[in-house]
Amino acid sequence: MSDPLSVNTVLVPVDGSDESARAVDYGVTIAAEYDASIHVVYVVGEEVVRGIEAGRVSKEAVADEAGAFADRALSLAEEASVPANNSTAFGFSPTRKTRHPGSVILDTADEIDADFIVVPREGGAENTGDVLEKAAEYVLLYASQPVLSV
């Protein structure tokens, strides 16, 4: 018989989409059930990274957006008495071909020693460029932790 699942840290990658907000809800619920903490990582996508590098997108505006989303996620965790923290990661690099949202999520999971990952999978039809819907399959295939795709 296998040991019961033990969860200390739940990782929830987000991109600011409605789907990632729903993933935070699930992540907080799982963390509360297992008396675990939650870590929300805001993954910045390729289009935004290229815009920052070209000077078309303000790095400060991206930081503000990521911070506002993280604040909402952390407030939700606080309401559920779940310890929470957050970070931001670029999910793309023009100089490293192996850097993409899926690898960033798994690298973050390793760095924070996450036991469980909740990843948004379905993007809205109007948001075909959502960063995380492209990464979900990669995470599902290669994560060493249990993954809930929502």
Model regions: which residues?
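Short, structured coil segments at secondary-structure junctions
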Residues: 34, 80, 135, 142-144
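Structural beta-alpha unit
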Residues: 78-117, 125-127, 145
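Glycine-rich, Arg-bearing micro-motifs that act as flexible, cationic patches
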Residues: 116-138
